[in-house]
From Swiss-Prot:
One of its GO terms (molecular function) is tetraacyldisaccharide 4'-kinase activity. Keywords: ATP-binding, Kinase, Lipid A biosynthesis, Lipid biosynthesis, Lipid metabolism, Nucleotide-binding, Transferase. GO terms for biological process: lipid A biosynthetic process; lipopolysaccharide core region biosynthetic process. It comes from the Bacteria. Signal peptide: none annotated. Belongs to the LpxK family. It catalyses: a lipid A disaccharide + ATP = a lipid IVA + ADP + H(+). ATP binds at A63, V64, G65, G66, A67, G68, K69, T70. Disulfide bonds: none annotated. Its EC number is 2.7.1.130. Transfers the gamma-phosphate of ATP to the 4'-position of a tetraacyldisaccharide 1-phosphate intermediate (termed DS-1-P) to form tetraacyldisaccharide 1,4'-bis-phosphate (lipid IVA). InterPro entries: LpxK (IPR003758), P-loop_NTPase (IPR027417). This is Tetraacyldisaccharide 4'-kinase. The lineage of its organism: Bacteria, Pseudomonadati, Myxococcota, Myxococcia, Myxococcales.
C-alpha cells in the first residue's frame, strides 16, 4: 500500500496523518463539485441513460478498489444463470492493454487472456462457464452486443455505480464492512468516488467482510443500508473454497496450507486482507510481496519472487485467483508445483432472501427468452 493509500484508509489519521493529507484538501473540493454536478445532470435527465433491452443489475461501490465487488458479481451472475437466464457481464476491463470493446467470453469459454481482457473479466470468464463476459469503456455498446449478438436476457454491470450512462434495474453497492469509507474524504484526499449520501440511489447494500466488522459498526451499517434503500443489507464473508496450483488445477485441500511456511504474492488494492486469509488458514507467511492493484506481473518479477521464497525456506508462493490470471502463463505453468492459488467466494451470512427479492423485482419486466443466436461471436 502506498503512502497516499495509507492516508486514505486510516479512519482516524491523527495529527500527522491530517497534516500529510492537508495538501489534498484543495483538490478534493473541485472533485466533489464535479461529482455533484454530474449526478445532478443524470438525476434531471439532462444526461441520458440508455436502456439495454434486458434487465441490468449493477454491482458497484463508493470507494476505489478492494470492497469485494468481484465475488459479489460472481454470486449475482451465478444466481441469475441458475434461474435459466442467459447472462452477460459487462466490465470496464481494468488492467487490459486494449481499450476497445471486446468479448472476453461468449459463454462457451474464455476467448481472451487477462492482458487483453483485464484481470476481472478473465477471472469471471474462467469461473462462470455459460456466462458471456464483455469488456470495454462504453458499457452501453457492450450491452447492445450482449443482447443483440449473444442473446443475453440479463446483464450484470461490473463496477457500475458511477457509470450512469447505462440504465439499470437494480443498483447493488458493495461496502467493506470492516472499513467502508476510509478517512471519509473524496478523491484525491480520500478513497471515495462519491459521498455516502449517494447510497440513496442504491437498491441494495452488500456488506462484504461482515465477519471482520465490530458488532457496533455492523449494526450502524445495517441502519445506514435500511435508511438508504428500504431494505436490510446482504452480508457476506470472503470464504476460501479451493486450492489450485500455478496452472490453475485443483491442488488438494486448503488444509495443506496449515503449518506451511509460504510467501504471499499479490497485486490488490488492499493486500492485508489476503494476508489475514492465509493466516486464518494456518499458513506461516514468511515473505510478502505486494504490487499495485491490477498489476500485470512480468516473468522476471515472478522468477524473483520464487527465488526469494526459496531463500526464505518457503514451501510455496501463494497468490489469489485474481492475481493468478495476470501471471505469465507459461512460467506459472512451468512452476506449477511451486505456486499455490487460493480461490475465495462470497459466502452469504445474512440477507439471501433480501437478495433474491431484489433480483425478482429487477427481473419483473424481463422480456421473454429468445432463441440463442445461431453462431457464436468471436
Amino acid at each position: 500500500m502506498s503512502g497516499l493509500e495509507a492516508i486514505w484508509w486510516r479512519e482516524r489519521p491523527g495529527p500527522l496523518g491530517a497534516l500529510a493529507g492537508a495538501p489534498l484538501l484543495l483538490a478534493e473540493a473541485p472533485f466533489r463539485a464535479a461529482a455533484a454536478l454530474r449526478g445532478a445532470l443524470y438525476d434531471r435527465g439532462v444526461l441520458p441513460a440508455v436502456r439495454a433491452g434486458a434487465p441490468v443489475v449493477s454491482i458497484g461501490n463508493l470507494a476505489v478498489g478492494g470492497a469485494g465487488k468481484t465475488p459479489a458479481a460472481l454470486a449475482v451472475a451465478a444466481r441469475l444463470a441458475g434461474r435459466g437466464r442467459r447472462v452477460a457481464i459487462l466490465s470496464r476491463g481494468y488492467g487490459a492493454a486494449r481499450a476497445d470493446a471486446r468479448v472476453a467470453s461468449d459463454g462457451a469459454g474464455a476467448l481472451l487472456p487477462a492482458a487483453e481482457a483485464g484481470d476481472e473479466p478473465a477471472l469471471l470468464a474462467r469461473r462462470l462457464p455459460g456466462v458471456a463476459v464483455l469488456c470495454g469503456p462504453r458499457r452501453a455498446e457492450l450491452a447492445r452486443t450482449a443482447v443483440e449478438a449473444l442473446g443475453a436476457d440479463a446483464l450484470v454491470l461490473d463496477d457500475g455505480f458511477q457509470h450512469r450512462a447505462l440504465a439499470r434495474d437494480l443498483d447493488v453497492v458493495v461496502l467493506d464492512a470492516s472499513n467502508p469509507f476510509g478517512n471519509g474524504h473524496l478523491l484525491p484526499r480520500g478513497p471515495n468516488r462519491e459521498p455516502r449520501t449517494a447510497l440513496r440511489r442504491a437498491g441494495l447494500v452488500w456488506l462484504s467482510h461482515a465477519d471482520r466488522a465490530a458488532p457496533e459498526r455492523l449494526e450502524a451499517l445495517r441502519r445506514l443500508a435500511r435508511d438508504a434503500t428500504g431494505r436490510a443489507p446482504v452480508e457476506s464473508r470472503h470464504a476460501p473454497t479451493a486450492l489450485l496450483d500455478g496452472a490453475l488445477r485443483e491442488a488438494g485441500s486448503l488444509e495443506a496450507l496449515r503449518g506451511r511456511r509460504v510467501a504471499a504474492l499479490s497485486g490488490l488494492a488492499r493486500p492485508a486482507g489476503f494476508l489475514r486469509t492465509l493466516e486464518a488458514l494456518g499458513a506461516e507467511v514468511a515473505l510478502a510481496r505486494a504490487f499495485p492493484d491490477h498489476h500485470r506481473f512480468t516473468g522476471g518479477e515472478l522468477e524473483a519472487v520464487l527465488r526469494d521464497a526459496d531463500a526464505a525456506g518457503c514451501a510455496w508462493v501463494v497468490t489469489t485467483e485474481k492475481d493468478a490470471v495476470r501471471l505469465d502463463a507459461a512460467l506459472a505453468a512451468a512452476a506449477a508445483d511451486r505456486l499455490r492459488v487460493v480461490r475465495v467466494d462470497a459466502e452469504l451470512l445474512r440477507g439471501a432472501d433480501v437478495l433474491e427479492a431484489a433480483l425478482d423485482a429487477a427481473l419483473a419486466a424481463a422480456p421473454q427468452p429468445r432463441p440463442a443466436p445461431r453462431a457464436p461471436v468471436s
